[in-house]
């Protein structure tokens, strides 16, 4: 059974589904302990295309509703969504999409991609497909 992430109060996804944020430090600590976390890149198309990097193993799931990568994410796996927009809006929207499909342990990354990069979190090259 997956451990619960440390939650940030007052954060919810649109539509009333709760999608509490997690910090970069919390996720880095979990990765250091060997925990498996699925990263979902929820950056808008323009930001995604202009970047050459993504978080390790991240799959792209667009906040505009491109859901073809949903089957790649096991419903029982911890998921962290990230974007580059204010208040993690796209990441929260994608988290809501995942939660509506039965994912339980889904959390937007507080500060998103930029906070991850500033903390020197691991990154990998982004391919054309994702």
Role assignments for model-derived ranges:
Residues 54-56, 102:
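Short, structured coil segments at secondary-structure junctions
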Residues 21, 39, 58-60, 106-108:
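Conserved beta-strand scaffold positions in the cores of enzyme catalytic domains, especially
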Residues 52, 120:
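Short, flexible helix/strand-to-coil boundary loops that buttress conserved ligand/catalytic motifs
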Residues 1-50, 124-130:
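Flexible, polar/low-complexity N-terminal or interdomain linker segments that lie immediately upstream
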Residues 33-34, 76, 119:
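Structured helix-beta-strand junction loops
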Residues 63-68:
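Alpha-helical scaffolding within the catalytic cores
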Residues 35, 102-104, 121:
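Short phosphate-binding/catalytic loops that engage adenosine nucleotides
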Residues 70-116:
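Catalytic cysteine-centered active loop of the rhodanese-like fold, especially the PTP/DSP P-loop
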């Amino acid at each position: 059974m997956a451990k619960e992430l440390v939650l940030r109060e007052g954060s919810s996804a649109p539509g009333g589904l709760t999608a509490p944020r997690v910090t970069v430090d919390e996720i880095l600590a979990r990765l250091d302990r060997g925990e498996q976390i699925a990263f979902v890149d929820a950056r808008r198309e323009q930001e995604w295309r202009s970047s050459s990097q993504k978080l390790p193993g991240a799959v792209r799931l667009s906040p505009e509703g491109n859901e073809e990568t949903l089957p790649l994410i096991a419903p029982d796996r911890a998921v962290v969504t990230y974007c580059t927009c204010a208040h993690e809006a796209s990441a929260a929207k994608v988290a809501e999409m995942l939660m509506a499909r039965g994912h339980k342990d889904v959390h937007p990354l507080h500060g998103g991609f930029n906070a991850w990069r500033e903390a020197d979190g691991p990154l990998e090259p982004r391919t054309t497909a994702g």
